[in-house]
């Protein structure tokens, strides 16, 4: 566990009767570990379920809800994963999901992909008991914030074609996984001459639209956010 400056999960939406934006639930933590994001998400969803009453999580969909995670800290590796049960709960309430972070002095982590791209979206599944296969992969050269949802859709589209039935349900028993690789820069290693705002490089925030979450749930897939700071070393 590592102490952080700010870490919170917020569930917000729009009142269907008044049109007023409201905060439904808010949970905070003073520390970071790889499981804390999933824990905070489920805590705010528990509070949201209480708010919705008898209608349960499904009742939150009328509020057009968004679940945001905010993180500000230093020297923290901000990788995390969401299991299929958490994805299912996000799907039930029709939520969009966003992760906004500011990490100074990100620990040095090598990407486990052979890539020079800043973002890569990858969908994999266990087609054989001992073999994880890349079903679809899309690279994004630069950290263009919030564009990754287009690439996620394209990855799912390729996965539909893989199954030949325009469905993701064929992956439900294949331990499917959607992984987002994201490069983190620091002031020290940023080499982009056109860079005028360091926040642009060292805040590779992202979002998952409700349609992406619905597709994750259809495939019974987990989600993994895998940040890194450097490419694989050249192999001699």
Could you tell me what each predicted segment is?
Residues 1-219, 226, 232-236:
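Acidic (Asp/Glu-rich) sequence patches and key acidic residues
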């Amino acid at each position: 566990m590592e102490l952080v400056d700010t870490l919170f999960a917020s569930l917000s939406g729009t009142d269907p009767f008044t049109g007023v934006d409201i905060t439904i639930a808010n949970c905070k933590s003073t520390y970071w570990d790889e499981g804390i994001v999933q824990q905070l998400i489920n805590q705010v969803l528990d509070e949201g379920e209480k708010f919705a009453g008898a209608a349960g999580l499904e009742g939150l969909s009328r509020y057009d809800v968004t679940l945001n995670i905010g993180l500000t800290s230093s020297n923290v590796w901000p990788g995390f994963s969401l299991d299929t049960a958490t994805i299912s709960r996000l799907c039930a309430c029709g939520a969009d999901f966003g992760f906004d972070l500011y990490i100074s002095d990100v620990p040095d982590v090598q990407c486990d992909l052979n890539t020079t791209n800043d973002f890569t979206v990858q969908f994999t599944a266990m087609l054989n008991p001992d073999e994880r296969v890349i079903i679809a992969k899309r690279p994004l050269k630069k950290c263009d914030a919030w564009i990754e949802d287009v690439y996620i859709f394209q990855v799912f589209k390729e996965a539909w074609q893989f199954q030949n039935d325009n469905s993701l349900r064929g992956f439900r028993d294949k331990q499917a996984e959607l992984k987002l690789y994201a490069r983190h820069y620091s002031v020290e290693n940023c080499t982009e001459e056109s860079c005028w705002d360091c926040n642009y490089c060292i805040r590779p925030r992202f979002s998952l639209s409700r349609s992406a979450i619905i597709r994750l749930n259809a495939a019974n897939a987990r989600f993994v956010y895998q940040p890194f700071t450097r490419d694989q070393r050249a192999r001699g």
